Amino acid sequence: MNWITNYVRPKINSMLGRREVPENLWIKCPETGEMVFHRDLEENKWVIPQSGFHMKMPAKARLKDLFDGGIYEAFPQPKVAQDPLKFRDSKKYSDRLRDSRAKTELEDTIVAGLGQVQGIKLVAVAHEFNFIGGSLGIAAGEAIVKAFERAIAEKCPLVMFPASGGARMQEGILSLMQLPRTTVALNMLKEAGLPYIVVLTNPTTGGVTASYAMLGDIHMAEPGAEIGFAGKRVIEQTLREKLPEGFQTSEYLLEHGMVDMVVKRHDIPETLARVLNILMKKPAKAVKRDTATELAPLPVAASA
């Protein structure tokens, strides 16, 4: 099939003067089956106009949409060891990295930057789900740690947009090490008296849920997002019983006190600004924190 698709069909189209039509010109709504032109979807922040279904949003587009005027300082991707375990399943891990980089034009799954949201300076971190399922590995962990350290240095809050299947299995224990590393960095931000807000997006699962995704001061969630540790099917097979309707969705978690609010994507910047304005105002008798002491950087899990 690949030989026909990659060689024969282009030759025939060339002879007949036909042009290849990109496969992603039209996007189908998973909920209603509605077909939406890709430009219309992008202009509507990757939300299906009729149904309101929230599609996965690219990390770069999310930060551009979040910050005032789409202007922000993008953080460089830290250099770490590539494929330290020389892992291979049905495909070499090094090949998966190369393919994901070509597909997303990113070095790894984390995109982070410093900018302003309605005049409030903050650091934002977003997962790119199209990069190996937004999984947390050495590079992603190091990028998150650096983002927390930058927020502390700038004395500003940090907003996290997780979208991940969990820890990156191709990096084994080195991937799992990022759970405590990112948690330590998160606690450094809290010790500095700075807010940490998490905006849970679809999906947020696995080790990411077991660490920084559920440790925010405030937890927002986009409508219909899948949020949990293990998948619904795995839980049902383990417990041998049917789970409640809507289990592991944003709305279910809001009803059961796991998230503070469900916010539509179009309303996120305004809602963040309103919440941060409240959190950043110091009470009249607030105890002054000493943040002058320089915080030592966390050790890198594996260096290049």
UniProtKB/Swiss-Prot annotation:
It catalyses: N(6)-carboxybiotinyl-L-lysyl-[protein] + acetyl-CoA = N(6)-biotinyl-L-lysyl-[protein] + malonyl-CoA. Pathway: Lipid metabolism; malonyl-CoA biosynthesis; malonyl-CoA from acetyl-CoA: step 1/1. One of its GO terms (molecular function) is carboxyl- or carbamoyltransferase activity. The keyword Transferase applies. Its main location: cytoplasm. Belongs to the AccD/PCCB family. HAMAP family: AcetylCoA_CT_beta. This is Acetyl-coenzyme A carboxylase carboxyl transferase subunit beta. It comes from Rhizobium meliloti (strain 1021). The gene is accD.
